[in-house]
Amino acid sequence: MNKIVVLGAGMVGRAIAIDLAKKHNVVSADICEESLKKLEAIENIKTIKSDLSNKKIVKKIIKDSDLVVNAAPGFMGFETLKTIIESGKDVVDIAFFPEDVLQLDDLAKKHKVTAIMDCGVAPGMSNAILGYHNTKMIVEDFEFYVGGLPQIRTLPFQYKAPFSPIDVIEEYIRPARFVENGKTVIKPALSDTELIEFENVGTLEAFNTDGLRSLIKTMKITNMKEKTLRYPGYIDQIKLLKDYGFFQTKEIEIDGKQIRPIDLTSKLLISKWKLEDDEPEFTIMKIIISGIENDKKVKYIYELFDKFDTKTQTSSMARTTGYACTSAVELVLNGNYTEKGLFPPEFVGAKNDCLKKMLAYQKDRNIIYKVSRKEN
């Protein structure tokens, strides 16, 4: 059995550890005792309470591992990934940090490491699917819509998060990049709001976020965009908080103490946005790829609708993100993907039967991507 270290035991990190423990010996490391306790009784999982912001501690934990999963919070994700690579360990990453991860490619090559980044549901599977089709056709347009939402809508936000609010807020303050007529366009996050109908849910609200990430640099496609999905009305609440400075990252003084408004906001929202372990929720995604295939105008549509798993008590967002990650872990361990360097999922999807294997792996866990093809 391989030894795999999962750094981070949040809702997604736990799902990853539990899934991998079916075949491997797993070490789960986190500073939160409450999160680690939920893993203690599971066979093949060892828990370690540790400060993952400490480089020396991380190096010690992963020293004798065969592969590492970086599921640390986004604010420490880049430095954690860098430490893993410097330690010469293969890694699959879902930290989704704001830094440009592609700058670590040379470092990964130097240490002869296979590093797969951003390998969740989106970014992640959305990238892998595009990467695959980009080898089979001339892609002209790529767009996708994605969101994770609670089944029970509670005002004012009608939203719950499986991860830290500060990571969610980061999506709302980071400028959104997309491609229009072959040129990169930058707009504020939360812009270009539109209402879209979905079969299983009804009307949802879509808005710009910076979800294309590596695709901006790696894919030469005329038009590309990504939008986040929420219940209608959510965007107005978020814009109000943003306009009044609640997401401000510059410190302000209150009674002689310096604080960042974003930290206070995140702390206050934890109780309101906390997704309970048994709370019903769903993940929804629609990917549209249009272009020329065998001299014909074609359109591929991938649709995902996944719900909270009542049998395993696992959230849909943890499942769809976590099992995308573990499917990539198996690709590396089984020798299906052996390239050395740092690779976004679009490169993985373009390789051999990697996308097919990732989809099959997730289908075994009842995560099903419905695919349709239309000729114009």
Question: Would you name each region that the model predicts?
Answer:
Residues 4-8:
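Conserved N-terminal Rossmann-fold NAD(P)-binding element of oxidoreductases
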Residues 13-14:
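N-terminal Rossmann-fold NAD(P) dinucleotide-binding loop
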Residues 32-35, 98:
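Helix N-cap at the beta1-alpha1 junction of Rossmann-like dinucleotide-binding domains, i.e.
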Residues 43-54:
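Rossmann-fold cofactor-recognition segment
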Residues 52-64:
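Conserved Rossmann-fold cofactor-binding substructure of NAD(P)-dependent oxidoreductases
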Residues 67-84, 97-101:
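Beta-loop-alpha module in the N-terminal Rossmann-like domain of NAD(P)-dependent dehydrogenases
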Residues 94-117:
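Rossmann-fold NAD(P)-binding glycine/threonine-rich loop
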Residues 135-376:
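C-terminal catalytic/substrate-binding lobe primarily of soluble NAD(P)-dependent oxidoreductases
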